[in-house]
Amino acid sequence: RSMCKDVYVFAEQRDGNLQKVGIELIGEARKLADDLGQNVVAVLLGNKIKDKASELIAHGADKVVVVDDEMLAEYVTEPYAKAMMEIIQSHNPEIVLYGATSIGRDLAPRVSARIHTGLTADCTKLDIDEETKLLMMTRPAFGGNIMATIVCEDFRPQMATVRPGVMKALEADESRQGEVEVVEVNFTDADMNVKIREVVKTAHKSVDITEAKILVAGGRGVGNVEGFKDLEALADTLDGEVAASRAAVDSGWISNDRQVGQTGKTVRPELYLACGISGAIQHAAGMENSEFIVAINRDEEAAIFDIADLGIVGDIKKILPKLNDAIKAVKEK
């Protein structure tokens, strides 16, 4: 354990594009590493991605460890887990952070099992304990009703996954200098336990709500599946995405990958339009860091108005179509 040092971040990329969550985690790792007097190291796995290292350094990494191989062109569990494991075994990190995305949620447990260390999933807060210097990993428990803080005293590295949108990215500083280390991993055909025949992109490029700049979110007040059509129309006009509260998801009006809140995703878009959402504390926890919040609700006492920058008391069924027409008219000018 005394050999272990530095805070490592799995810098997720898809199709050669760095994902926002990796940049956010480097910002958080910077704070943790500064508390420990250590460095931030980003791990970049993929194919023809080495040129992305400078972006990671600009956002706060001191060093980038790159594994560039054709076997890593698309995310496949086995080759990625092997690369990650070899880096951890040769570099001995103190802490490793992953985004709680479909990739991170697949990779992190696999790696933690192989190197025999713990993993705390879906953390919403990370701190270094002043006395023990251990990583304090906080996450919602019991359906989001309490927050539990977990420590990994005996094993290294200390590992956690963190949802996109929870941590704040640092502004890019292009003048920052850093080191890039290229690591060779000897992959064999046996590592490729999956054959990718083709990658099919969906026609409507639905963006992960944590990546969207504008979100039009609906709650119980939307009323039904039909009601979400008005939200979708407005989101299309604004080049945004549709999101929802737990009530709307539980009612089956929209898929759960659109859920914002303590048991859903945490988002910080530039604009969050809350339609028929009462603003329960669990929902607010997932969106209160949005840059600008507009709330539309019939109930003028709704808690959502307490955190909204702009509030409209009224019926969304009447307001949304008019709002959509007005925005379209402005865009056409």
List each model region and its residues.
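N-terminal glycine-rich FAD/FM-binding segment characteristic of electron-transfer flavoproteins
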Residues: 1-333
